[in-house]
Amino acid sequence: MAEFFATNLWPLLVVIGQSVLLLVILLIAIAYILLADRKIWAAVQIRRGPNVVGPWGLLQSFADLLKFVLKEPTIPDGANKGLFLLAPLVTCVLALAAWAVIPVNAGWVIADINVGVLYILAVSSLSVYGIIMAGWSSNSKYPFLAALRSAAQMVSYEVSIGFVVICVLLCVGSLNLTAIVEAQDGKWGMLGWYWLPLFPMFVVFYVSALAETNRPPFDLVEAESELVAGFMVEYSSTPYLLFMLGEYVAIVTMCAMGTILFLGGWLPPVPYAPFTWVPGIVWFSLKLLFMFFLFAMAKAIVPRYRYDQLMRLGWKVFLPLSLAMVVIVASVLQFADLAPK
């Protein structure tokens, strides 16, 4: 054991330091992305949004954090206390864990593994367990019904996202996220990114990501006019905050996935100066914010689907379309001799 630590202590400390730094940056970014979400929603409704705490309301998210932390958490009588408190922690930790493999610039990744996309899909799939645990452990029928809704919804749209990944995999020949970005690098710039040749799959990914993260118009899990707060109805204080944090981290993760799979990751839109002078992390951040803007606009302007419409869209529209696109992409790559060697 002593020999192991003597050999691996420094690399271990480096990874821990990188993880803590990423965690701090991500949590601060989430605070302002939440504020941006509220501001965009307010602008669509011709309101000002949060504008009291700090200049232009920039400290509103931190005030909300303080409010949640200072509140007393309540646990319902008859609830399974252990699972009730574990559920939000599971949801939040799994959402944060996905960022271990996401490259935000060339070489800027904690774990550059060859199955990065598969890892993200696996971690995002596991988050449904936190929701099921929350609904079941609350010992109330309404959170349990909402948790079942969520499980069915997330499983339905994970299938479509899986076929989207297969299409990109066919074009790249690798599940490594860095390799996917590098495969989109070329003299055509943004016209060579996969959003153009795989545009139907880009649309499928965008809509499926909305459903996967329980965002409007697919927020049937926590529809305010129907279920109040869905599976979170019995939660308050810090556990509720962890659920909210996990939800927004999952949204940003899906935005990052869309950026890497279809928008060229950290690559500049035009591969010539002065665009190449801008650091890759800036391009990645701008593309991620563009994807989040699409998420926020869907929340602001699209009415909520009925549950039967949600399931019909997933199984009767997206699944056949995704399967057809996989066959078409594979056929074109094979007969045009464009398949990666």
From Swiss-Prot:
TM stretches of this protein: 13-33, 82-102, 115-135, 161-181, 190-210, 248-268, 277-297, 313-333
Signal peptide residues on this chain, from the entry's feature table: none
Enzyme class: translocase
Keywords: Cell inner membrane, Cell membrane, Membrane, NAD, Quinone, Translocase, Transmembrane, Transmembrane helix, Ubiquinone
Catalytic activity: a quinone + NADH + 5 H(+)(in) = a quinol + NAD(+) + 4 H(+)(out)
Location of this chain's protein in the cell: Cell inner membrane
PANTHER family attached to this UniProt entry: NADH DEHYDROGENASE SUBUNIT 1 (PTHR11432), NADH-UBIQUINONE OXIDOREDUCTASE CHAIN 1 (PTHR11432:SF3)
Protein name according to UniProt: NADH-quinone oxidoreductase subunit H 1
Annotated organism of origin: Rhodopseudomonas palustris (strain ATCC BAA-98 / CGA009)
Lineage: Bacteria, Pseudomonadati, Pseudomonadota, Alphaproteobacteria, Hyphomicrobiales
